[in-house]
Amino acid sequence: MEPSPAAGGLETTRLVSPRDRGGAGGSLRLKSLFTEPSEPLPEESKPVEMPFHHCHRDPLPPPGLTPERLHARRQLYAACAVCFVFMAGEVVGGYLAHSLAIMTDAAHLLADVGSMMGSLFSLWLSTRPATRTMTFGWHRSETLGALASVVSLWMVTGILLYLAFVRLLHSDYHIEGGAMLLTASIAVCANLLMAFVLHQAGPPHSHGSRGAEYAPLEEGPEEPLPLGNTSVRAAFVHVLGDLLQSFGVLAASILIYFKPQYKAADPISTFLFSICALGSTAPTLRDVLRILMEGTPRNVGFEPVRDTLLSVPGVRATHELHLWALTLTYHVASAHLAIDSTADPEAVLAEASSRLYSRFGFSSCTLQVEQYQPEMAQCLRCQEPPQA
């Protein structure tokens, strides 16, 4: 094929015999009309981001931490520094005051420091790319970090509950009311500061299913999807639990300061507010278990997704519909679509994928298109799962 003159200065091509060119193998070459002739490309070239997304919803994210995760990391760094400083102060104050409640609060802060350090590590780990072994990447390291945070709080609280029970049985202890009151006041201020730092306020323009706060929907549920970083949420729940206990310790310290004979308020406040701290972990624990058990993402119902797929022209039935979440912000769907023999599979696939992405904010969708068979209505494996 060789260029020949054409109107307007453009080039056209025509077939040429190998004898005319003396080329080997009779291969055909096509020179671009828009670029200067260049050397042939190597046989193996690196893959690049395409200007159009033939099967992907979003452009390829840049390497490293996303803006949402960078924001989460900054939150955790700041909260961890504040937590460590005030933890050291509470250890000293609790020792001087001989207060188990203060030491309890310091132990909770120690658990917070450890959990936030673990969360920072899990955030870094979650940025590692997918491999042939870890095909989904390391997204769930955030969820595992949140689970470790909850478990650590439960363990520390259990130990302190035991110590509070022992103090109630044996009253051979003395409380320094003044030191306890001062330390408890500082602890309340510290926990308020950490709660402010960890408040789930993401960076601007966090759109899409990977946003830090809400995923806007083009259609579908009226309420936005509440999202967030699980590591920051777990740390925030820790701080809320500590804040509740700090208020209880402050109330007990005021009572002991003015009425030293009521020193039993120290272990009693430890007992009561430790239980409150355990209860505060319930929302995070529920989300973690839902993710690890491959449950349907929050605010994404099975029936709405199924009805959306069935509303696509040409789709007769759907089965093998699975919805799950890698994290609170990364939702995945897969399904088989049984279509009419007259339907265009490519058109059905494009329309179904578009509706799932736009209405429910899925990060990844895998759909298999197949011809509808009447036997599917009686097939056991093609039936919908029962209600939970």
UniProtKB/Swiss-Prot annotation:
**Dityrosine (Tyr-Tyr) (interchain with Y-372) cross-link, renumbered residues:** Y357
Q: What spans does the record annotate as topological domain Lumenal, numbered to this chain?
A: 97-105, 167-177, 257-264
Which SUPFAM superfamilies does the record associate with it? Cation efflux protein cytoplasmic domain-like, Cation efflux protein transmembrane domain-like
Give TM regions: 76-96, 106-126, 146-166, 178-198, 236-256, 265-285
Keyword Ion transport part of the UniProt annotation: yes
For the region Disordered, what residue ranges are annotated? 1-46
Gene Ontology cellular-component annotations: cytoplasm; glutamatergic synapse; hippocampal mossy fiber; hippocampal mossy fiber to CA3 synapse; late endosome; late endosome membrane; lysosomal membrane; microvesicle
Membrane topology value: Multi-pass membrane protein
Q: Where is the Dityrosine (Tyr-Tyr) (interchain with Y-357) crosslink found in the sequence?
A: Y372
In the record, the effect of Y330F is given as:
No effect on homodimerization
UniProt similarity note: Belongs to the cation diffusion facilitator (CDF) transporter (TC 2.A.4) family. SLC30A subfamily.
Return the protein name: Probable proton-coupled zinc antiporter SLC30A3
Q: Which organism is it from?
A: Homo sapiens
Gene of this entry: SLC30A3
